[in-house]
Amino acid sequence: MNTPKRLLFVTLVASAALLPAVNAGPETALTGPVERYISIDNACAWPNLTVLPDGTIIAAIFNRPSHGQEAGSIEAWASQDGRFWEKRGVVAPHEPDTNRMHVAAGLAQNGDLVMLSTGFTNLQQPGQSKKLPFRDRLLPPWVCRSSDGGRTWTHTNSFPSPPEGFGPFLVFGDIKAGADGALHASAYAQKDDDPEKEDRAWHFRSDDDGRTWRIISVIGTGHNETALLHLEGKRWLAAARTIGPQQVDLFRSNDDGTTWAGPEHVSEAKQIPADLARLADGRLLLTYGTRVADQRGVLGKLSSDEGKTWSAPIRLADSLSSRDCGYPSSIQRPDGKIVTAYYSAGVGDHTRYHMGVVIWTPPSSPPTP
């Protein structure tokens, strides 16, 4: 598939003094040097970052400048440090009059990249009226795999079908390995003909290094996009987006995802969805978008007790010009700096969709709420 040539725009912010808080609430600005980049231009992106064994950072992105309402594919882009990026391959090429716009991504135990991808068809379905562009029917997930760092990919239809009465699964978040080497992922689905539009978030497990998957449990009812993080042993943390207030709830499992306890609210309304990461010093990092008017951007929180308590929000991205923004994904470089990627429909004078990146140093003593 031919894609528009992308231009790279770079902005380096030398001091957090240039990053004022956007409201009078408890959130704080970053301290120390901060780098900001418009890294991949003219793409809605919804980035998901994965670090390869050789240290290369891979961003899985949706490659079109639309909120999923035109034909497009999931691509893999590569960077050595999070600053500059180049296209490496097409993870999930779309078929005619369809798109592949959703992705879950991670590493297999053998070092392969494993991604799951879903999308929509634009073809009117039998017995139904025509829906909005590229919203006629959700396509079942593909299982995508690359053994050469994201350059070439294979695809299978080996992801499980949803339980009877539910529509196809829609994937999200990271694919993580547990203590026993099994891979774990999340996806959500909606009841057919449900007037309440009540999503359920499921937990999945693969015992063959990501080649086939099976349903393990429901994480939350009334929740959809869910990030997973392995803590230790059989303990897991999940950060799930709610349907109603549009906030992030935490769930916990002590039995490798067989059962989940929660929810615990961890963000305010219109602050979604989330990403979870473990830092080198043992702390947890939660990053999430905020679509609150006059506060749009990306926030982060740190936890020193496995997610039981969290710091006050730290402002990572600011002045995004539309509520069409957020979906952060974060990794930590060997030098300790955090690379947080996110998407935005525009910022300041730059009015195109893009993947933005902020490179920052986590504070040693984060602010208390």
Enumerate the language-model features and the residues they cover.
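N-terminal secretory signal peptides that target proteins for export/translocation
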Residues: M1-P4
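Bacterial N-terminal signal peptides
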Residues: F9-L18
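Asp-box/BNR beta-propeller blade signature and adjacent active/binding-site loops
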Residues: A21-P369
